[in-house]
Each structure stands twice: as C-alpha cells, then as structure tokens.
C-alpha cells in the first residue's frame, strides 16, 4: 500500500469509505486476514452452535469492558485442576449453600438452547463483613475467566458504578452471569436503584425511550443473570424478591478458610471447567439434554 500511494498521502473529505476496499485490492489475497468483531459474549445466534468468548480464536474479536473479565481458557488451564478447584469452592461453605450458587452460574448459557431465555432469576449472596462472600463469588466467577480473581475487576454497585453503568455492562454479558459486588442500601439511590436494576436485567432491557423526533432509540437486549453480593436483600418489593435466590453466608469470625484458599490458588484452572461446559452445550447431545430438561421445568 505504501509503495502504491505513499506513506503520507492524505485521505480527502468523504473519501474514507473507499479506503477499506482500496486496501483490500492492494493486498495479496493470501495475506488478507478476515476478522469479525463482536461487542458481547454469548451464543452467536439462535442455533446455539458457537459461543462468543474473548480469546476464543484469532479470527473472532470480542470487545467487552475490562471489568467483565470473561475469557476462553489460557494455554496452561487444566481441567483436572479446575475440577479440584470447584470441589474446594463447594466445600468452602456449607454445600447446601454453595451448590445452588454453582448451579446458577452454570445456568445462563443453557437457557437459550433450552428455549428458556425469558425464565431468568437473580442470585443474592448475603452476609456481614467477614463472611467471605465477595472472595467466594470472585473465585466462582473464574469459571468464565481467570481475571475475575482480581479486585480491580470488581463491579461495585453505588460507589463504583451507577445503575445505568451496570446496565451498560450487562448489555455486553450475554448468556453469562454478571457479578455485582457490595450492594448497600444507603449508597447512591440504595434499594430503589437495586429493585429497578433487577427488574430491568431480568426483563431483558431498560425502558424504551424516544428521541425528540418521536422515533424510538435503539435499545440493547440484556441476557445475563445478575449475581449480587451485599449485607442484606431489600425486602420491600415482593416482585423482585420472587425473582431472587437468596443465599446467606455465615460470618467466618476472622478464621482462615483452607478450602477457599485452595480454590483461589487453583482459580486460573476453573475456566477450563466453564469452557468444557460451553463446548458440551453446543454439541447435539448437549442441545438434546437441555431441551429434555426444559420439558420438566
């Protein structure tokens, strides 16, 4: 291209649209990579045969905000070590508390193949400071990317992100859980924002808005399941409570939790478990099993 036009040639007004095809014509056919960019995760289409995830391959580019650290497993991720980490994660608290949350984390990618895309519920992990709810939830989210273990990637409600910002994050996180940390009733607009946020996410999008001309603004669909941590769940709105699985962690009294520590040390391998789950769901056997499960719902 430089030999044909010169490295400092200008692009005239309204001619930029011709630049891409010109580069294509001046590039040898075998040296022209084809890449597709998406701004969300999740199933590529309703056939549910390909799941979009950052790092999945070199020809598919997934651009999502840093704080939703979804990622295909790195080269060193080991499934056996990931399963061991998952076992430690379940045993870190009472299994009757942790098992339902783990099941809820596996649920988002199977809803659309099962035809249950509108049958979503949220998860709220409650507990006082020192119950390790955030540390446990961070580690569990590593099922879908090792970067969730970093505190820098925590999406904090109120003090760290407004309701509208969280809705924007949710629009990128299709068919996956979205961790929202540290809900506090006295931060920001408190329970009012929380109730509206849960309704908006579970109903598939924010309210419709129009422009001054009367035309409707484009709205992005929401297809994630919120997993929220906080000291207590707002009890004033019956409709939102009915759509939330509440799990309460006991205070740990400042004592070390060896199972959680072991899970954290192996957290980089947890994404191998999540990736195996996603790959199985896209197989004929996986799709058949999800549809059979949907019939019993």
For the regions a protein language model found, what residue spans apply to each?
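Conserved glycine-centered beta->alpha loop in an early N-terminal alpha/beta scaffold
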Residues: 1-96, 140, 168-169, 173-175, ...
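P-loop NTPase catalytic core of nucleic-acid-dependent motor ATPases
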Residues: 57-156
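AAA+/P-loop NTPase substrate/partner-engagement loops
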Residues: 136-191
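AAA+/SF3 P-loop NTPase mechanochemical coupling elements
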Residues: 171, 210-228
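Structural recognition of the conserved hydrophobic beta-strand(s) that form the central parallel beta-sheet
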Residues: 181, 223-231, 246-247
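Residues immediately C-terminal
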Residues: 185-186, 233-235
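Conserved catalytic/switch belt of AAA+ P-loop NTPases
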Residues: 194-213
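Phosphate-sensing "switch" segment of ASCE/P-loop ATPases
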Residues: 220-222, 237-297
């Amino acid at each position: 291209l430089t030999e044909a036009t010169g490295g400092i040639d200008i692009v005239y007004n309204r001619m930029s649209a011709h630049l891409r095809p010109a580069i294509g014509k001046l590039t040898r056919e075998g040296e022209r990579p084809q890449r597709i960019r998406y701004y969300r995760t999740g199933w590529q289409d309703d056939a549910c045969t390909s799941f979009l995830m950052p790092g999945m391959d070199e020809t598919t580019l997934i651009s999502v905000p840093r704080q939703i650290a979804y990622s295909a497993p790195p080269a060193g991720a080991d499934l056996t070590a990931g399963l061991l980490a998952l076992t430690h994660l379940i045993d870190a608290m009472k299994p009757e508390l942790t098992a339902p949350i783990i099941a809820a984390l596996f649920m988002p990618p199977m809803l659309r193949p099962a035809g249950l895309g509108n049958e979503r519920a949220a998860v709220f992990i409650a507990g006082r400071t020192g119950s390790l709810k955030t540390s446990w939830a961070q580690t569990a989210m590593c099922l879908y990317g090792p970067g969730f273990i970093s505190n820098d990637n925590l999406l904090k409600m109120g003090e760290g992100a407004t309701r509208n910002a969280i809705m924007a994050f949710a629009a990128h996180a299709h068919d996956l859980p979205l961790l929202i940390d540290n809900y506090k009733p006295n931060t920001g607009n408190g329970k009012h924002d929380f109730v509206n946020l849960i309704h908006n996410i579970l109903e598939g999008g924010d309210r419709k808005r129009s422009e001054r001309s009367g035309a409707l603004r484009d709205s992005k669909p929401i297809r994630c399941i919120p997993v929220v941590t906080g000291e207590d769940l707002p009890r004033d709105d019956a409709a939102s409570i009915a759509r939330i699985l509440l799990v309460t962690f006991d205070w740990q009294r400042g004592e070390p939790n060896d199972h959680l520590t072991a899970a954290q040390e192996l957290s980089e391998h947890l994404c191998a478990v999540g990736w195996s789950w996603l790959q199985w769901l896209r197989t004929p056997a996986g799709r058949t099993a999800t549809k059979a499960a949907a019939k019993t719902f």
